[in-house]
Amino acid sequence: MENLNALSGNQNLEVWQLRLYVAGQTPKSVTAFINLKKICEEYLNGQYQIEIIDLTQQPELAIEDSILALPTLVRKLPEPIKKIIGDLSNTEKVLVGLQILPSMDWKI
């Protein structure tokens, strides 16, 4: 398990706790991490913590968040818990799925 912290000195802002479940360092897992890191850097202003959980090393941890597919991103905080499956390459879907940006489903 690897912890990657990017916390700024300003602790007044809410820290996003994100957990990325992967199965080793496959191309899809690496892509998911790169995409997640890019999104966090751009939209969360350094107020995030990413925890990488490799289920090939710790398969029992999949039970805690009911992980059925990989890679899976779990937003632990802020609540409610949210999950996104895949390589996180569609930035807009990730932003909406994590509720960083509101859904733009409506048409004018």
Swiss-Prot record:
Q: Name one Pfam family in it.
A: KaiB
The GO annotation for biological process reads: rhythmic process
Give the signal peptide range.
Answer: none
Q: Which InterPro entries match?
A: KaiB-like, KaiB_domain, Thioredoxin-like_sf
Please name the PANTHER family in this protein's record.
CIRCADIAN CLOCK PROTEIN KAIB2 (PTHR41709:SF2), KAIB-LIKE PROTEIN 1 (PTHR41709)
Q: Family, per the entry?
A: Belongs to the KaiB family.
Function, as annotated, reads: An paralog of KaiB1, the major clock oscillator protein in this species. A metamorphic protein which may reversibly switch between an inactive tetrameric fold and a rare thioredoxin-like monomeric fold (KaiB(fs)).
> Could you tell me what this protein is called?
Circadian clock protein KaiB2
